[in-house]
Amino acid sequence: MNLEEAKLKLSKYGQEQILRYYDELSDDEKNALLEQVDKTDMEVLSAIEHKSELVKKGEITPLDAMELDEIKANYDTFKNTGVEAIKAGKVGAILLAGGMGTRLGSDNPKGMYNVGINKELYIFECLINNLMDVVKETETYIHLFVMTSEKNNDVTVSFFKENNFFGYKSEYVHFFKQEMAAATDYDGKIYLEEKGRMATSPNGNGGWYISLKKAGLTQVLENNGIEWLNVFAVDNVLQRIADPVFIGATIEKHCAVGSKVVRKAAPDEKVGVMCLEDGKPSIVEYYELTKEMMDAKNSKGDPAYNFGVILNYLFRVSDLETIVGKNLPLHIVEKKIPYIDADGNLIKPEKPNGYKFESLVLDMIHELDSCLPFEVVREKEFAPIKNATGVDSVETARELLKKNGVAI
């Protein structure tokens, strides 16, 4: 894209401020900015005008989970089916690792955070160790696709190489970058994060399959006959990945997607909850739960909305192609966005000052006809690291790792 073409595009969307410092840039910086303007989807910006209409929930009803007693009763069947699928090369894993460790006080990717006390033990290492348990059990390596972001890709790839992929076979590890979306002020004007660069942020965890596809990695799925993808987040160091019992249960129950869930610690715990929305699987966020929903009971007398999601899903690949063809709902989120002001100074705001645009995994699930909420034991599979201290922190994760026999 040349300068005139960039001016035309920016003029069409009222974003001429992007070129405010163009004349001050080096030739390389100018080319980089023009390329960024070319690649950026600016159609999404119009969504700000319809923000209140964007994501409206339909009728919410409970969705029963497969609970621990049912899993135990069918354990052998589920496990055999899952092991068979893994041995046949039908299972891959997607690690969502685009985030930075900012809230943990680190400038590195979150997965590089050291949770060890007496030795170095990185979040990435914990996850690879968990996946290696299944590799050893099934004597089969599983293709692992690691989604990074523009901001952390190079350092993430280098970190894996420096650590010899934590003992995993490198030919089974594939890196790809998450697509980015522009970040704007409250009037929909895109911020500059540098004089020659628009402010951007990752486009939400619902963009992972489109990003995988754009990176050409769906070819790896086809070439290897991968039919199921276990999608999981970087910040839960205890989660079981490519868990044969979970895979087997989803297959045996003929569900399009499986979702690992934990029993909520309290009715108002800040976790999304599996449900049905207009008869199709969905997730209702904790802040959307009404008192009536929190008090509702199922036929056993247990809370009807009792199982929280832990961002560990199993998707059938054939369904993902269908989902990609549809426009997932757009979520507009208020965030603190560092920006270059009119005087050329970098401002780091103390409170939210604009919007980021995201699509979410929960909207992918809602496009499917069936979902299996699969209960796991919280203390064995849920140790999220969101904060440096307090709830869901490095401290609490360390305690849970120790309880599960992990040397730290």
Where are these regions (language model features)?
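N-terminal glycine-rich phosphate-binding loop and ensuing alpha1 helix
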Residues: 3-174, 182, 193-202, 206-209, ...
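A short linear-motif detector with a strong N-terminal bias
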Residues: 72-74, 91-93, 124-125, 153-156, ...
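Conserved beta-loop-beta/alpha segment of the NTase-like Rossmann-fold superfamily
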Residues: 165, 170-269
